[in-house]
Amino acid sequence: MSTICAISTAPGVGGIAVIRVSGPDTFKICDRIFRPKKAGKSLSTQKAYTLTYGSIVGNNDETIDEVIAAVFRAPHSFTGEDTVEITCHGSTYIQQQILQSLISSGCRIAQPGEYTQRAFMNGKMDLSQAEAVADLIASTSAGQHRLALSQMRGGFSRELAELRNQLLHFTSLMELELDFSDHEELEFADRSELRTLADHIEQVISKLAQSFSVGNAIKNGIPVAIIGETNAGKSTLLNALLNEDKAIVSDIHGTTRDVIEDTININGQLFRFIDTAGIRETSDAIEALGIERSFKALDQAQIVILMYDLTRDLKDFEAFYQEIAPRLTNKSVILAMNKCDVLPTSSLPTFSFPTEGWHQIAISAKSKLHIAELQQLLTEVSSIPTLHQSDIIVTNVRHFEALTHALEAIHRVQEGLNSSLSGDFISQDLRECIFHLSDIVGEVTTDQVLGNIFRHFCIGK
């Protein structure tokens, strides 16, 4: 195993920077370039969790910078290996010179995510916890931070471990029955107990899988589709919500020909806004493709902002509503009446279609009138429940897919027990359920999958 080094702090100039060195030759390499302020304070002789002040030198023993070196000894470090973290001044030149000095002394530059991958390989964390490290680094809202921290601390892993241990117990008994298959009267695994266990595990896995809709919304943002006729002000509203010119705005009908997405944190909750192409009959093939994507975005949204231009014919809008009405079922709908600044409040229309349960607001996307009120309304209608520290919420697509496969396997176990299926078939489905649960924490994950997961990390992590 080679000894690796990388800058662990964010790129660019800052007050300080941290360079992490990890591997079997960490202390030998660092001692070659570290000059302690006090004699006899070489890093290889220091106790774990100590800080030593000194200098880093380069070629010809020239000082590069005065630094503080933190010592971590295996296995009690992030990677489980001997580790030194060098805190230097934040100059990019200084950082690169220290890296070059480390490389010249025997280190190599770490690959993206290699520190966390080594932590996983050395048993410091399982794969779901490693993925949570990446989520924690990328968190931009309180919800994302809370869920990533909970998963990194192992709550999800412990839940899965309990399920796997129970399944392994009964699987071993089923396998024992197969070893004594010539004695048909022998039954080591009590079928009644196994049925009770299968029902319990089915309930737990179902609950975990169902939590993904909430977890995905917290991690990637609650999907909000901005829907309306052409030139209703959808792109202008997106720009107003984001407070930037994200979408092109024009008086020409059909300007937006594709969906445009961006996220914004409102009161600690992440929303993913989707500006869609105006829905209308068209002979333009490209615009028609954009409208098709608008319908797809509408179907996937949890919240729909339905835009109505108050200066347009109400009958046209009501006809437009009839076209999309079936797609609004079970969605939170906000009817945003745009251009209220050019009409008196008394002129707001009464709609012929049912709007019970909808939220209505008069806005001006162009002048940003009542945009703050619209943002507040979005937080009120979002369906994210109040989460507690002990709640286990699935946020990762890979985990959700594995849980779905495990659920299918446990359903086959239940069906097999109800139909008195042979023990070898039931045992096979039990093993498959265990396999998919183990895949989540990385006990059976292939090198290809591991590489795909860790390459999305930053180099210094």
UniProtKB/Swiss-Prot annotation:
Mg(2+) binds at residues 235, 256. The keyword Cell membrane does not apply. Its main location: cytoplasm. One of its GO terms (biological process) is tRNA wobble uridine modification. This is tRNA modification GTPase MnmE. The gene is mnmE. GTP binds at residues 231-236, 250-256, 275-278. Its EC number is 3.6.-.-. InterPro entries: G_TrmE, GTP-bd, GTP-bd_TrmE_N, GTPase_MnmE, MnmE_dom2, MnmE_helical, P-loop_NTPase, Small_GTP-bd. Homodimer. Heterotetramer of two MnmE and two MnmG subunits. It is found in: Cytoplasm. GO terms for molecular function: GTP binding; GTPase activity; metal ion binding. Binds 1 potassium ion per subunit. Residues 221-383 form the TrmE-type G domain. K(+) binds at residues 231, 250, 252, 255. (6S)-5-formyl-5,6,7,8-tetrahydrofolate binds at residues 20, 85, 124, 461. It is an enzyme of class 3 (hydrolase). It comes from Parabacteroides distasonis (strain ATCC 8503 / DSM 20701 / CIP 104284 / JCM 5825 / NCTC 11152). Keywords: Cytoplasm, GTP-binding, Hydrolase, Magnesium, Metal-binding, Nucleotide-binding, Potassium, tRNA processing. Exhibits a very high intrinsic GTPase hydrolysis rate. Involved in the addition of a carboxymethylaminomethyl (cmnm) group at the wobble position (U34) of certain tRNAs, forming tRNA-cmnm(5)s(2)U34. Belongs to the TRAFAC class TrmE-Era-EngA-EngB-Septin-like GTPase superfamily. TrmE GTPase family. One of its GO terms (cellular component) is cytosol. Its cofactor is K(+).
